[in-house]
From Swiss-Prot:
One of its GO terms (biological process) is arginine catabolic process to glutamate. This is N-succinylglutamate 5-semialdehyde dehydrogenase. It catalyses: N-succinyl-L-glutamate 5-semialdehyde + NAD(+) + H2O = N-succinyl-L-glutamate + NADH + 2 H(+). Catalyzes the NAD-dependent reduction of succinylglutamate semialdehyde into succinylglutamate. PROSITE patterns: ALDEHYDE_DEHYDR_CYS, ALDEHYDE_DEHYDR_GLU. Pathway: Amino-acid degradation; L-arginine degradation via AST pathway; L-glutamate and succinate from L-arginine: step 4/5. Belongs to the aldehyde dehydrogenase family. AstD subfamily. PANTHER family: ALDEHYDE DEHYDROGENASE-RELATED (PTHR11699). The keyword NAD applies. The gene is astD.
Length: 492
C-alpha cells in the first residue's frame, strides 16, 4: 500500500512500478500508480478537510509542523540512506538535504509572519487591516533531484497557511515520498490534510486536471512547466507556481586565487552530478594567460572526480545520476555538441554499462553557431571565451532562461554592473551558483519560472491577501457628500 489518501494507506490501481538504485540495480520500492479515480478521491478528501484545517489557530498548525521537524531529526539517518540509495547521491549530500528539510520549518514560520501575517493601521474613523487566507486545495509536484527538500519547500508553508494538499512525488523517487508521508502521519496531521498519490505522467495529468484544485505548485523541467501552464490556461482563479530550470552562466574574470575559482566552479557545475537547477551550464572565461591558467587547473582537478556509490568510503564528491537513461542523455548531448564543432577539453565517460555513473565533461563552444539553448541536466559544462566584460554580460543573457548567474571577480564595480544588466533571479558574486539561502527568495524569470519564487517568498503563493476597513460603531458623517439630504421633514 503506497498511496496515502484521507488518512489511509491504500494500494494504487494504476500502472505497476519498481524503483531500483540507479548505480547497483538494487530493488528499493515496488508499488502501483494512483489511477484517475484515486486522484479524484484524494481531491475530495483534501476538499473535505480544508474548512476544519483552515480554521485551526495558527499555533495548532505550527505545532504539528514542528512535530514533523522533530521526527525528521529522530529519523535523520534512516531518511538520509533512503534519499541516497534512491537518487544515487553520496551519503554526505543526502544528509545535508535532510538537514535542509529540518531547517525549513523554523524559516517557514518566520516567513509566514513576515510575508503573510496580519497588519493594522489606524484611520481617523476606524482601522485598515491586512490579513491572509489560504487558497484551499493545492497540488504539489515534486522533483527527483531533491525529493525531500524541494517538495518540503512547498508543503510546509502551504500547511502553515491553512491549505490542504495532494502531493505527487517524481515517479523516479517514490520511496522518499512515501517515507516522508509516514513522518507526517506520525506528526498527527488530520485525515485528508495531506494526501500522497504516486505515479508518472498519467497520474500527473489527472491531478492537474482536477476541478477541486485551487492551485498547483511545481518544481521540475521547463517542458513540463510549460505543459502545466497550457493546461491551466483560462483558469486565472487557480494559483500556479512554476519553479523550473536554467542554462546558467558563470563568468570568470581574472580570479586572484585560481584554486578558489576552480573550487567554486566545480561546486557550481558538478555538485549533485550536475542535477541542480542552478548548476552552471555555461562557463564564460576571459581570454588571456590568467584565463588559460584557470582552465588548465579546472581540467586537472575535474578529471580526478570519480563518481561512486552512495555508501562508498572514502565518500565521493558525486554519485550517479538519477537513472541510466538520464546519464545516457547527458553523454549524447556532449556528442551532439562535439559534432557541431565543439572542442572537447574533458570527455565524459560512462563508467559501467547499465548504471548512471558518469564522469564530468567539459567542452569549449567558442565561435560555434546555433548552439541549442537547452538545459542539460547533468555534469556537462560548456566553455566560452570573451574579450570584454560587456561581451560576457551579453553572452550570459543570451538565453531564454533566467534562473541563476554568477561572477568570479575581485572588482565590485563589475558585480554592480552585472546586477543592473543580468536577467536572472539569482545573481551571485564570488559564491557558487548552487548556493541558496532560505531567507531569500528562490526563482527565476523567462523560461525559469512564472514570477512565483519559492524559499522565503513561498508564503506569498500559499495565501491570498484580504483587506478590511473596520469600525466598531456606525455613525452618520458630520460632512455629507454633495447631493445627499438627510434632513427630516417636520410632521404636519
Amino acid at each position: 500500500m503506497t498511496l496515502w489518501i484521507n488518512g489511509d494507506w491504500v494500494t494504487g490501481q494504476g500502472e505497476r512500478r519498481v524503483k531500483t538504485n540507479p548505480v547497483n540495480g538494487e530493488v528499493l520500492w515496488q508499488g502501483s500508480d494512483a489511477d484517475a479515480t484515486q486522484v479524484a478521491e484524494a481531491g475530495r478528501a483534501a476538499r473535505a478537510a480544508f474548512p476544519t484545517w483552515a480554521r485551526l489557530p495558527f499555533a495548532a498548525r505550527q505545532a504539528i509542523v514542528e512535530k514533523f521537524a522533530a521526527l525528521l531529526e529522530v529519523h535523520k539517518a534512516e531518511l538520509t540512506a533512503i534519499i541516497a540509495r534512491e537518487t544515487g547521491k553520496p551519503c554526505w549530500e543526502a544528509a545535508t538535504e535532510v538537514t535542509a528539510m529540518i531547517n525549513k520549518i523554523a524559516i517557514s514560520v518566520k516567513a509566514y509572519h513576515a510575508r503573510t501575517g496580519e497588519q493594522q493601521s489606524e484611520l481617523p474613523d476606524g482601522a485598515a487591516t491586512l490579513r491572509h487566507r489560504p487558497h484551499g486545495v493545492l497540488a504539489v509536484f515534486g522533483p527527483y533531484n531533491f525529493p525531500g527538500h524541494l517538495p518540503n519547500g512547498h508543503i510546509v508553508p502551504a500547511l502553515l497557511a491553512g491549505n490542504t494538499l495532494i502531493f505527487k512525488p517524481s515517479e523516479l523517487t517514490p520511496w522518499t515520498g512515501e517515507a516522508v508521508m509516514k513522518l507526517w502521519q506520525q506528526a498527527g496531521l488530520p485525515p485528508g490534510v495531506l494526501n500522497l498519490v504516486q505515479g508518472g505522467r498519467e497520474t500527473g495529468q489527472a491531478l492537474s486536471a482536477l476541478d477541486a484544485l485551487d492551485g498547483l505548485l511545481f518544481t521540475g523541467s521547463a517542458n513540463t512547466g510549460y505543459q502545466l501552464h497550457r493546461q491551466l490556461s483560462g483558469q486565472p482563479e487557480k494559483i500556479l507556481a512554476l519553479e523550473m530550470g536554467g542554462n546558467n552562466p558563470l563568468i570568470i574574470e581574472n580570479p586572484e586565487d585560481i584554486d578558489a575559482a576552480v573550487h567554486l566552479t566545480i561546486q557550481s557545475a558538478f555538485v549533485t552530478a550536475g542535477q541542480r537547477c542552478t548548476c552552471a551550464r555555461r562557463l564564460l572565461v576571459k581570454r588571456g594567460e590568467q584565463g588559460d591558467a584557470f582552465l588548465a587547473r579546472l581540467l586537472e582537478v575535474s578529471q580526478r572526480l570519480t563518481p561512486g556509490e552512495w555508501d562508498d568510503e572514502p565518500q565521493p564528491f558525486i554519485g550517479g545520476l538519477i537513472s541510466e537513461p538520464a546519464a545516457r542523455h547527458v553523454y549524447e548531448a556532449w556528442q551532439r555538441l562535439e559534432a557541431m564543432g565543439g572542442r572537447t577539453l574533458l570527455a565524459p565517460r560512462m563508467l559501467k554499462a547499465g548504471t548512471s555513473l558518469l564522469t564530468p565533461g567539459i567542452i569549449e563552444m567558442t565561435g560555434v553557431k546555433q548552439v541549442p539553448d537547452d538545459e542539460v541536466f547533468g555534469p556537462l559544462l560548456s566553455v566560452w571565451r570573451y574579450e570584454r566584460f560587456d561581451e560576457a554580460i551579453r553572452m550570459a543573457n543570451n538565453t531564454r532562461f533566467g534562473l541563476s548567474c554568477g561572477l568570479v571577480s575581485p572588482d565590485r564595480k563589475q558585480f554592480d554592473q552585472l546586477l543592473l544588466e543580468a536577467r536572472a533571479g539569482i545573481v551571485n558574486w564570488n559564491k557558487p551558483l548552487t548556493g541558496a539561502a532560505s531567507t531569500a527568495p528562490f526563482g527565476g524569470v523567462g523560461a525559469s519560472g512564472n514570477h512565483r519564487p519559492s524559499a522565503w517568498y513561498a508564503a506569498d503563493y500559499c495565501a491570498w491577501p484580504m483587506a478590511s476597513l473596520e469600525s466598531p460603531t456606525l455613525v452618520l458623517p458630520d460632512s455629507l457628500s454633495p447631493g445627499l439630504d438627510f434632513s427630516r421633514e417636520e410632521p404636519v
